[in-house]
């Protein structure tokens, strides 16, 4: 059995952990997105759902093959909206930054122009039906993932 999670989000064992998801999330909290957000669409999953999927895959005898573990097809803008609702004091832009602008600043934001050209503005949807059907996965709501993560980071 192979477990393939999408963009992993949510509270961690160590609130000071480092990962791409922690860096992205901290960008919302630190004001990195105050002028606007990239048109970045992605599939994402709560870290606790990833852990549950691993356990279920290990204990369900019929589990086999590859499982896409993904709770939601979402976007940076949606994450920003949820955070703003949870904490109105956060300074998060409410508009989508143009792709050409993202392309220009790519080197300054630890990205490449190729990454911007191939990821910004394109939908990315993951299909999780096999994990739901075979592993009986029930994914946590995106709002809970973000709320719990925000609470953990504020407490640390």
Q: Over which residues does each language-model region extend?
A:
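NAD(P)-dependent short-chain dehydrogenase/reductase
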Residues: 1-41
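Glycine-rich Rossmann NAD(P)(H)-binding loop
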Residues: 10, 37-40, 67-74, 84, ...
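Alpha-helical substrate-binding/gating segment
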Residues: 26-67, 71-72
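Conserved C-terminal active-site "lid" loop/helix of NAD(P)H-dependent oxidoreductases
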Residues: 47, 105-136
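Mid/C-terminal beta-alpha module of Rossmann-like enzyme folds, strongest
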Residues: 53-113, 142-153
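Hydrophobic transmembrane alpha-helices of multi-pass solute transporters/permeases
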Residues: 125, 152-155
